[in-house]
Amino acid sequence: AATNLLGKFNVYNMTAAISAAYLLGISLEDIQEGVANLEEISGRFERAVENLPFEVIVDYAHTPDGLEKVLEASKNITKGRTMLVFGACGDRDRAKRPIMGEIAKRLADRVILTDEENYTEDAEQIRNEIKSGMGEKLPAHIKEIADRREAIKKALQIAQKGDTVLITGLGHEVFRVIDGEKVPWNDTEIAREITKELFEK
């Protein structure tokens, strides 16, 4: 059965769901129709922009395990480079930051380290803690752009045919907490806005 969902983890989930449906006596035709009509879940390996020569995927991955899985899933669907835009949340588990930095360095072909939402922490300090997992000197494939919109824009500008731009950390969220203040924000909508600015002239 064909589906619109991306990523190997979705294949595993669908396999389990198909098996359960079959065991419950649901016909193969109904199962096939159900799978074909599945829609992406907002912020979960979501294709944010259509009709570009490269993929733009938004995912909520905000833990080391989540980041590793989504990068591996991206590599499985990408002919070109996997380009990661990511950061880490403030006022949360600080120990995971260098681990996520190491994972990003190891698995992504290009990395743009950016701010996510700092809450009440110093945003630069959060980035520094992520960078501590990337080695003493940032490798050439890693750039740091604090402004999240500019980081996403840069990734979209340098993406080439067959690449995947992967924007992680906020997923389906519709706001960020910056210096204690809620600010409207959605990675998918921002990626779409920037795409229009760059490619629909």
Task: Give, region by region, the residue ranges found by the protein language model.
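A short glycine-threonine-serine/GTX helix/turn-capping micro-motif
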Residues: 1-8
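ATP-dependent carboxylate-amine ligase
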Residues: 6, 16-201
